[in-house]
């Protein structure tokens, strides 16, 4: 486990009509994070089975914290600590986010984030606390052997963007966090 990464497992109430749950409470996010997180934008992406997006992050002054959840389908979500001064530098966590389990993953600034789609398709929503800046965007190779990430790819067929195919391994990455 990496203490700064927070997995929210909301309780939801089901009955004959369907279900209800609080999908977002700013005060609970702030309390769990230990500081005021100011989400300013919400993004949504839809991907098909085998699509791998990651491992992405942005440098200051556009670094981003994220709150990620699956609206449809399921993904294996991965987060890597890329803060050089951290005791958990280079370590990662993985968890399955599904539309059914309604888990949400809080990813603070200073971490690389990515996911692979496990279901036929998946729709992911993520709130961010800073705007996208292409000049500040960076990535880490998803298949960096030193990280030892198990992507649970049974057939080794993945779909990557050209940009993600060219990300450096962590050891060769110059632009990280202190």
Language-model region placement:
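Short beta-strand His + acidic residue motifs that chelate non-heme Fe in jelly-roll/DSBH
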Residues: 105, 113-118
């Amino acid at each position: 486990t990496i203490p700064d990464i927070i997995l929210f497992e909301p309780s939801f109430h089901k009955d004959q009509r369907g279900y209800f749950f609080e999908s977002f409470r700013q005060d609970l996010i702030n309390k769990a994070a230990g500081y005021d997180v100011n989400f300013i934008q919400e993004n949504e992406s839809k991907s098909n089975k085998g699509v791998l997006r990651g491992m992405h992050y942005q440098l200051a002054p556009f670094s981003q914290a994220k709150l990620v959840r699956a609206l449809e389908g399921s993904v294996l979500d991965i987060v890597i600590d890329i803060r050089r001064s951290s005791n958990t530098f280079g370590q990662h966590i993985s968890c399955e986010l599904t539309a059914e389990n309604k888990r949400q993953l809080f990813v603070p600034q200073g971490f690389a984030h990515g996911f692979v789609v496990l279901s036929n398709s998946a729709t992911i929503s993520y709130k961010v606390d800073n705007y996208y800046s292409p000049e500040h965007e960076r990535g880490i190779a998803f298949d960096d052997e030193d990280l030892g990430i198990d992507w649970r790819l049974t057939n080794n067929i993945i779909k990557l963007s050209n940009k993600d195919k060219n990300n450096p391994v962590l050891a060769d990455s110059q632009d990280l966090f202190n």
